[in-house]
Amino acid sequence: MSARKYFGTDGIRGRVGQGVISADFVLRLGNALGRVLTQGRSKRPLVLIGKDTRISGYMFEAALEAGLVAAGADVQLIGPMPTPAIAFLTSTLRADAGVVISASHNPHYDNGIKFFSAEGEKLDDATEAAIEAALDEPFHTVESERLGKAIRTRDAIGRYIEFCKASVARGFTLHGLKMVLDCAHGATYHIAPMLFRELGAEVVVIGAAPDGLNINAGVGSTHIDNLAAKVRECGAHLGIAFDGDGDRVLMADDQGNPVDGDDLLYVLARSWQASGRLTGTVVGTLMTNYGLEQALAALHIPFQRAKVGDRYVHQALVEGGGTLGGETSGHLLCLDRASTGDGIVSALQVLEALGRDRQSLRDALTSLSKVPQKTVNVRLDGGAAKAIVEAANVQQALQQAQAAVRGRGRAFLRPSGTEPVVRVTVEADDAGLMQDTLDRLSGAVRDAA
């Protein structure tokens, strides 16, 4: 397949008002999607549009709506909702596509567009290529009698809450549990507190007062220290932090210790194995901590690594018949419960596992020993990152680094595809060995640059 012109690994994203993240481009994008969906159809396609809480969402929602309606597609406006909720609603409302206006964990001045298929899954490469091709064609408005219509959906919140509840056993309850929720001033701000309270938890909420500008600003899964401090302050059993669009989740235990995606993957894998729910191979990424790989091996749980990005984790799970995977950042996939990464559903799976195993979050992690890991970004003065990584002296240094940590960790290089940077990562069970190996390997990359 030829290189993508607009789409990245997770839709289209960037700074508002710069490049393609502009109202006129999003208008054309909506029109392109509408034209792709109407091809070969006599019936008007239906497209759902959701968004997070950043202020530019209003502008892009209107632009998408206009472009789609002009192409002859009907639109349902969902309003602020978690990204995975749009995936679910696209499927359950029998829509032909779902669109989310969000830049996930990025600051308010960024925004982006993500797409879902009729099945509530990320678009395949062929459909993305068709949309890109349509973008290079003139804007088209159908005859007046074929124009689409737009309505605002009123029952989306209730539908999604019931979907989340259905992901755990019918008798599941959180009575007696005190938790802190950090909603990142984002798309989960109204849903998550309601859901966890309905399940019986005592909920202390932070990061749930969005103003369009404060999404992810010092709150949420990218600023876990705030959650940890609040857990300690109010004596909660644990804390849960989402990112701005609700597809990531991180936690803090009762002592305020941060719990990342690798930790949560371990809790779920071990519990699911014991209950017979675990199938296939657990999938992580190149960045998944070596300690998790070793801990799963000790439990005889097969594990494999995919490229960084939940798109690639999902692909590996589907190809290998697995249902559990995730990233250190908190993108967790529980494919027997949701078609995409869902922060709320993932949090419920962890809480259900802890309840079934009669363990606190801290106790559930006592058998997992992660190793020190560090990444250094080496910025290049010239030359492509891929060419630097493939240079003979860099490859020799990489082989030496891998030999130094063999059986105790890993060493690898990742050339950036978007900037002149080589990411150098080393992890080892000894911090001194890790740092020494990292210094040597990153030095070799700098010398080659």
UniProtKB/Swiss-Prot annotation:
Activated by phosphorylation. It catalyses: alpha-D-glucosamine 1-phosphate = D-glucosamine 6-phosphate. The modification Phosphoserine is found at S104. GO terms for biological process: carbohydrate metabolic process; peptidoglycan biosynthetic process; UDP-N-acetylglucosamine biosynthetic process. Mg(2+) binds at S104, D243, D245, D247. GO terms for molecular function: magnesium ion binding; phosphoglucosamine mutase activity; phosphomannomutase activity. This is Phosphoglucosamine mutase. GO terms for cellular component: cytosol. Binds 1 Mg(2+) ion per subunit. CDD domains: GlmM. Its cofactor is Mg(2+). Coiled coil: none annotated. Catalyzes the conversion of glucosamine-6-phosphate to glucosamine-1-phosphate. It comes from Xanthomonas axonopodis pv. citri (strain 306). Belongs to the phosphohexose mutase family. It comes from the Bacteria. It holds the Pfam family PGM_PMM_III. InterPro entries: A-D-PHexomutase_a/b/a-I, A-D-PHexomutase_a/b/a-I/II/III, A-D-PHexomutase_a/b/a-II, A-D-PHexomutase_a/b/a-III, A-D-PHexomutase_C, A-D-PHexomutase_C_sf, A-D-PHexomutase_CS, Alpha-D-phosphohexomutase_SF. It is an enzyme of class 5 (isomerase). Its EC number is 5.4.2.10. Transmembrane segments: none annotated. Keywords: Isomerase, Magnesium, Metal-binding, Phosphoprotein. The active site is at S104.
